[in-house]
Each structure stands twice: as C-alpha cells, then as structure tokens.
C-alpha cells in the first residue's frame, strides 16, 4: 500500500516550490483539489495527502463490497450481442451538432445511419470519479449511495467476455475507485497512447476474436482539459485555438474553438468504431461522465460547486446509441424501444444506464428496475 500511496501522491501533481508543497489546480478532478484547493494554488501538508488517501481507500472498499447483481436471479437469451459502452470524458451535449449545435462538430455522425439519440442528458455528478459510480452501479440522483455493484459480474455469469480498456491514468483523476467498479472484468488494460483513436488498434482484433458475447467498456480522454493537447492537427477544424491557463477568459473563443475540436475528434473516433462493428451483432452506447464550463458564470472546467446545480453546464452530456443491421435483425424489440424513448421528450440521466446496459445484452435480471430500463425488456418477473 505504501507504493500505491506514493504513486497516488505523484499523480496528484504536487509541485515543490520555495520549500513548500503546492497542488497543481490544472487537474480539476484531483481528489486533493476537491478537498483542499481554492481558486489559487495553496500550501498543503502531507497529513492532508494521507487523509485523502484513506478516505478514497474506504470508498473503494465500500464499492468493492457491494452485493453483486450476479447473485440475483437472471436469464440470458441465446443471441448474445457485442455491447460496447463508451465512457466519454468532459463532453457537453450541447456542443454536438447532432444535438443542434450551430457548428459542425459531428460531420461524420450526421451521415451515419442507425443512431438513436436521446438528446442532451444530465450526469450523476460533475467529476469522473463520482460519475462512474452513477454510471456503473445502481446509484441514482435521488439515492446516491449504491446498493448493488457493477453490472460486469452479471455479464460474466452469462458467459460474456468482459473487457475494460482505458486511456485514463490508473491512479490519476478517477483513482482506485475505478478499479473497484471494473475489477471483475476479465481483461483490464490501461493505455498511455497519444490519442483516443489509438484505442481502435486494440478493438479491431478484439472484435475479430469475439464476434458475439462481448461487453467492452472504453474509457476515453475525450474532451478533458488541456483541450489543445487532446487532439492532433487533423482535427483542428476551429481556429485559433491557442490560450494559456491564465488567459482563458481573455481568449475565451479560442478555448471554445479548442474544445469543439475535441468533439470533432470524438466524432471521428465513434464513426471508426461503428465501422469496425458494422458486420457484427453489436450495439454501442456513448455517454459522457459530465459536462464542462466554458466561461459561463466566469468559470471554466468542472468539479465546481459540488452537485453542479449552480453551474448546470457541468452536467450537460450527450447520450446516444448506434446499432448494426444484424443487431436490428436479432433484437428488433430493443431497437424499437430505444427509438420510442428518443421521441418521448424525456430528459434522461445516468440513472438509466445501469439497467439499460444489462437489457442490451439480452439479459433479464432481478437487479433491473423497470422504470429505469429504457428498453423495458430487462426485468425478470
């Protein structure tokens, strides 16, 4: 545990300056920032570091000890599809042109068929480490403490290959809370590759090996700050995109340009992922963990104000599905239900994700709450 603690401390980007320890506020999801940082860099002690570590460790242990949905009665159909859950990062739903944004940030997705868009949804929290709890357990906005662990063991129970591929730092923003949520996956990989697109080099052979009965979680870096460093020149559609942390308000339009370029990058990533799956029995869910402030209220980034009600842009997220022809052929009832939901006018939240993902795998379970299953097909009577 000592080695883990030392890695955790270094991942929080603590800087030595003038004989004192400081926290780098440029990482908005650092638990130390969440507990200790103000708008300016402030001194902090090793005691605070240890305290935060143990708080996180206790949370991790509580998550790991939650009852598993695999322990409850469940059934699974013979046709087991590929289910891919793309955990987007810091993406705002109202900056996607498929949601009516004035800039063409989704030139490829606008041309893709078989997308079912739930519109602009609302996140469980305003930082990754908390939102993942709302996305991967049965926690809801109303009942924020989960009573059931991740759905991954349930897919394991029914013979699915389960994988978690991430470009997020293992001990960084999400901390080891992530490990507690995805630790039952059969294949867990963390990548330090330059872009999200590099994940596609890993998914292509995976889809050739497992042509059905696969649950894959892809945790991308998406639109996380620093925006300009989060995409290549290929996706520099909106310019100028130069700014510094100190000049973000002065160069707000440049910041927005850079942010929108990250959405263009995500557009390309998803289109290529869909292309890899077009001949498979597959469905892809894309949803972001939280949104982002882009100068509204004089603020930037996220993880500001606790619940996010004061700055709602932080909870503004995209939420949509893509399905293949073969999936529609074999699971037409799921497709019909999702299409119906997309025209309901309802504002969807992370509350629905847990129960709906189970149903997408053709699994019916006592763990599924019918009012939170968008398909209406995952409940076991």
Regions found by a protein language model. Name each.
Residues 1-7:
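Membrane-interfacial entry segments at the cytosolic side of transmembrane helices
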Residues 9, 223, 292:
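Extracellular glycan-modifying ectodomains
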Residues 12-246, 316, 349-380:
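Active-site-proximal alpha/beta segments of enzymes that process anionic O-linked groups
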Residues 67-74, 201, 241-284, 321, ...:
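A long, amphipathic alpha-helix that forms part
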Residues 84, 262-303, 354-358:
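Metal-dependent active-site segment of extracytoplasmic phospho-/sulfohydrolases and closely related
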Residues 100-104, 282, 287-331, 368-370:
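Histidine-centered active-site microenvironments of extracellular/periplasmic hydrolases
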Residues 143-147, 253-264, 307-315, 328-357, ...:
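A short beta-strand-to-alpha-helix junction
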Residues 233-253, 301, 327-337:
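Flexible internal linker/loop segments at domain or repeat junctions
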């Amino acid at each position: 545990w000592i080695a883990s603690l030392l890695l955790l401390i270094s991942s929080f980007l603590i800087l030595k300056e003038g004989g004192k320890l400081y926290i780098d506020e440029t990482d908005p999801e650092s638990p130390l920032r969440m507990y200790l940082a103000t708008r300016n860099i402030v001194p902090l002690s090793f005691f605070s570091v240890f305290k935060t570590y143990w708080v996180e460790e206790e949370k991790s242990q509580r998550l790991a000890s939650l009852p598993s949905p695999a322990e409850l009665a469940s059934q699974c159909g013979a046709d087991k599809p590929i289910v891919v859950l793309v955990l987007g990062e810091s993406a705002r739903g109202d900056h996607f042109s498929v949601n009516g944004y004035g800039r063409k940030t989704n030139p490829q997705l606008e041309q893709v068929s078989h997308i079912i868009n739930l519109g602009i949804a609302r996140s469980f929290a305003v930082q990754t480490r908390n939102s993942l709890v709302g996305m991967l357990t049965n926690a809801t906005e109303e009942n924020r403490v989960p009573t059931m662990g991740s759905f991954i063991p349930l897919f394991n129970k029914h013979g699915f290959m389960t994988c978690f591929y991430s470009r997020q730092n293992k001990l960084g923003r999400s901390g080891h809370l992530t490990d507690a949520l995805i630790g039952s996956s059969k294949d867990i990989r963390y990548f330090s590759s330059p872009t999200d697109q590099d994940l596609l080099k890993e998914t292509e052979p995976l889809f050739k090996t497992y042509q059905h009965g696969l649950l894959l979680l892809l945790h991308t870096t998406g639109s996380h700050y620093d925006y300009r460093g989060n995409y290549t020149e290929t996706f520099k559609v909106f310019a100028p995109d130069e700014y510094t942390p100190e000049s973000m308000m002065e160069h707000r339009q440049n910041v927005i340009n850079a942010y929108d370029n990250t959405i263009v990058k995500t557009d390309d990533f998803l289109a290529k992922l869909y292309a890899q799956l077009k001949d498979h029995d597959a469905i892809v869910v894309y949803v972001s963990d939280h949104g982002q402030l882009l100068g509204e209220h004089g603020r930037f980034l996220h993880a500001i104000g606790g619940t996010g009600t004061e700055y709602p842009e932080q909870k503004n997220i995209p939420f949509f599905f893509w399905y293949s022809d073969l999936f529609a052929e074999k699971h037409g009832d799921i497709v019909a239900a999702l299409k119906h939901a997309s025209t309901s006018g309802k504002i969807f939240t992370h509350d629905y994700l847990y129960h709906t993902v189970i149903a997408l795998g053709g699994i019916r379970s006592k763990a599924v709450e019918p009012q939170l299953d968008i398909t209406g097909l995952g409940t076991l009577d």
